[in-house]
Regions:
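Bacterial N-terminal signal peptides that target proteins for export
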Residues: 1-10
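Bacterial N-terminal signal peptides
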Residues: 10-18
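Loop/turn elements at helix/coil->beta-strand transitions in domains of secreted/extracellular proteins
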Residues: 57, 70, 82-85, 125-130, ...
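Active-site-proximal beta-strand/loop segments in catalytic clefts of secreted hydrolases
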Residues: 61-64, 77-78, 89-92, 132-137, ...
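Metallocarboxypeptidase
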Residues: 72, 178-348
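Short beta-strand-to-loop junctions in surface cap/lid or active-site-entrance loops
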Residues: 74-82
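Active-site/substrate-binding loop(s) of hydrolase catalytic cores
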Residues: 97-100, 105-242, 306
Length: 348
């Protein structure tokens, strides 16, 4: 009877899971690692943040999602009599979850340091900061729950078959804004970039339009992630800026962000993209052209040395990404204050 040496088998059983986890830790992890905010815990997370300084923060419901009537939450942070406002939207696309964590960490920093820290104190004296962790609670629910890794759109039944087809149904919320919408050729409803049946057809976008009409936004920043890696760690400006003063201001603020954020895995910093950008109904085009608001998009999450786009990293990298992007946002806010102060002085 042949004997079997069990030691190599035991060794393999112990080591292989470790090797697998180490490989995962350097790439994408799905289901998401434990420190990602999950949809079912978002409301409680927001309540905890407001509790830090309830006199300067309020949780708002600005609207509801198109298919499932889920609330779209916002945090309104700062003094109520502040004359200007800043908008940060952490997520338009369900799979792009890094911005949710970043936006909540930003809110926590603002409230934890106010009024002790000079930077936060001065900012919140003059600006209200509106933070919307996710504009797409439907897509966020699908991805954060582990149902599907790549879910870009909301859950509208776009093929009208009376059921949710996770991979194809939905509208790309960042192509549904009513500026340049008619120029977008993406009309196939099963496309991941489907722009919707008409401009602002989605209730999520209607909520943002209403908010924009009510507030005097001096800056709008939209956090995204590039699943393909083509746009990783780039900052995109509005289309058709035409070198105007407003465009130059937008570009200068974006440059501050880029200079403040090092790439995740490769050498160098984030880059402001200098080529032509999409003439579609996206958020930055809408705010820039409709309201004259400096607005730009930041693609969070880098490519590793193998060229793989990492938008669902492990906890350790997640924390690093969140920390440096919160610092970049704060640097942009400080630069905005400086520029606005100079503009006001020049008007006197």
């Amino acid at each position: 009877m042949q004997t079997i040496d069990v030691l190599p088998i035991i060794f393999g059983m112990l080591i292989l899971p470790c090797l697998f986890s180490c490989v995962q830790a350097k790439g994408n992890m799905y289901p998401l690692d434990t420190k990602y905010i999950k949809a079912e815990k978002l409301n409680a997370e927001l309540d905890q943040i407001v509790h830090i300084s309830p006199e300067f923060a309020e949780k708002r419901i600005i609207g509801f999602s198109s298919a499932e009537n889920l609330p779209v939450y916002a945090l309104q942070i700062g003094k109520k009599d502040a004359s200007k406002a800043i908008l940060v939207i952490g997520q338009h696309h369900g799979e792009e979850v890094l911005g949710v964590n970043i936006s909540l960490a930003l809110a926590e920093r603002l409230l934890s340091n106010y009024p002790k820290a000079e930077k936060e104190s001065h900012l919140l004296e003059h600006y209200q900061v509106w933070i919307i962790p996710t504009l797409n609670p439907e897509g966020f629910r699908i991805v954060s729950s582990g149902m599907l890794r790549n879910k870009r759109k909301n859950n509208r039944d776009t093929n009208n078959n009376q059921q949710l087809d996770l991979r194809t149904d939905g509208v790309d919320l960042n192509r549904n804004y009513p500026v340049f919408w008619e120029l977008d050729t993406e009309t196939e409803n099963n496309s991941p970039y489907y722009k919707g049946s008409e401009p602002s057809s989605e209730s999520e976008i209607k909520a943002i339009i209403t908010l924009a009409q009510q507030q005097n936004f001096a800056l709008a920043i939209f956090l995204h992630s590039s699943i393909s890696g083509v746009s990783s760690e780039k900052i995109f400006l509005p289309a058709k800026g035409n070198g105007s003063e407003l465009f130059q201001k937008t570009s200068s603020l974006a440059a501050v962000y880029a200079a403040s954020a090092k790439k995740d895995y490769l050498k160098g910093n984030y880059e402001v993209y200098n080529g032509s950008t999409s003439e579609v109904g996206n958020a930055r085009n809408y705010f820039f052209h409709r309201y004259g608001t400096p607005a730009f998009l930041v693609e969070i999450g880098g490519k590793n040395k193998r060229g793989q786009s990492i938008i669902h990293p492990s906890n350790a990298m997640l924390e690093k990404i969140v920390d440096k992007n919160v610092k970049a946002l704060m640097n942009v806010f400080a630069e905005l204050e400086t520029q606005d102060t100079k503009e006001n002085e020049n008007k006197l």
